[in-house]
């Protein structure tokens, strides 16, 4: 069985990463597995532990770092996010193409760590910073101060888009999802 690819899919908070992935994750031709991240942030309404994230406390997260159990991790606005190593490697060994939906800081670590591996890197961009701000406000899950910090961070993150193999502008979720699927299919066919 051929080992699966590692797909790094990142972009600013609120750009629509989760929405886009939900449109293609179950496509059989892509053979995708979603890498579930570990986080110390509070669970949002409707989120399920072990499905959306592994929600842990700060002590459990620190232990995972010390035991080298995370491929990458980053902290933002007091919350930590990381990718559990054993889950990703197990899925790839099973032939699955594993999608890491991660923050830009963590993504850059993965791009460096796996640069000689079967890696696909895709950066999702908003049509504009104003549109991104509207999306974050529409979520209605964070304070205005947190949204301001996310916009500042996004402005910086967008400058890093050229570190990725592919860029997709999310001006329409269906169109962006189709672009993402096409990129993955083309990369699978080339290997």
Swiss-Prot record:
Pfam families: Guanylate_kin (PF00625)
EC number: 2.7.4.8
UniProt keyword annotations, A-Z: ATP-binding, Cytoplasm, Kinase, Nucleotide-binding, Transferase
One function term, GO molecular function aspect: ATP binding
Ranges of residues in domain Guanylate kinase-like: 4-185
NCBIfam families named among the record's database cross-references: guanyl_kin
Function: Essential for recycling GMP and indirectly, cGMP.
Catalytic reactions on record: GMP + ATP = GDP + ADP
EC top class named in words: transferase
Chief location: cytoplasm
Annotated protein name in UniProt: Guanylate kinase
Gene3D superfamilies from the UniProt entry: Guanylate Kinase phosphate binding domain, P-loop containing nucleotide triphosphate hydrolases
Cellular-component GO terms for this entry: cytosol
